[in-house]
Amino acid sequence: MKKIYLCAISNIRSGACNEDCRFCTQSVRWGADINRYKEKSIETIVNEAKLAKNNRASGFCLVTSGKSLDEKTLEYVCSAAKAVLKEVDITLIACNGTADKESLKELKNAGIKIYNHNLETSREYYPKICSTHTWDERFQTCENIKSVGIRLCCGGIFGMGESNEDIQSFINSLKQLKPDGIPLNFFIENPKLPLKATHNKEFAINIVTRFANEFKEAIIMLAGGREIVFGNEWTEALRAGANSIVIGDYLTAKGEKPDKDLEILIKEGFEIADEC
């Protein structure tokens, strides 16, 4: 019986980003119609963590919009992490942009076990999807994460017009980092964003198979865009090599109802992991 890891996301600061990532609705430059707010209350975050635990999630990710983990964001995330861990037995993940070693050490001391920072795509293609910061800054953050003893979760977004060569270059870069987890996102179109999706189900299955074969020791996560590219046939991606999904909503896009995902997983014979 294949074991599947479930991860829930809490977008604790939404839509306040000045970067120009062409795939992201949280950038203020594109004017996407999303829910924007500065900070969720700590009480709300704790309640969401409890709900995630009830939905069998073994990981709970605290996500903030913006380029980097600045001092104010660091204080907020640490406070949220400590509050959650007082009441919920769950693995905490942070996703707060580029970060230096000292800030990451503080997160670790607050109870963060995993840090998610995606390279998104190849070094060569990155300038075509973002001009306000570099791919190298992202790679450096990933190295910082590993150097302080936090587990690295690092993946990308597919179907943004990248070539097969870009995907291979991206894989080669990930091999240097050896992440514990690799989220595979499939670009979600929005009428305000300047990109159009270049993916379909066959493409997505190929991506899953390719990454599962290249990274046999990593957790391969079906993340954003799962419902769009696979519809109700997303368990095919689990059989193709993925062993994790995001349960519940994404950052600004609605996900499937957790009870429906759980019902499908159990019905099709998958085991749900108790910890990650």
Q: What is each stretch, according to the model?
A:
Residues A99-N109, M160-K175, E227-A240:
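Catalytic cores of alpha/beta
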Residues N172-C276:
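Auxiliary Fe-S-binding modules of radical SAM enzymes
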Residues L6-T44:
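Canonical Radical SAM [4Fe-4S] cluster-binding loop centered on the CxxxCxxC motif
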Residues V28-E48, A52-C142, R151-G155, D180-N185:
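Core AdoMet radical
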Residues L85-K86, K146, I266:
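Anion (oxyanion) recognition and catalysis
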Residues I45-E48, Y76-V84, S103, E137-C142, ...:
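A general structural detector for well-ordered alpha-helical segments in enzyme core domains, enriched
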Residues C21, L62, H117, I145, ...:
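Conserved, mostly hydrophobic/aromatic
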Residues K67-D70, T141-E165, L184-A197, I219-V229:
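Conserved strand-turn element in the central/C-terminal portion of the radical SAM core barrel
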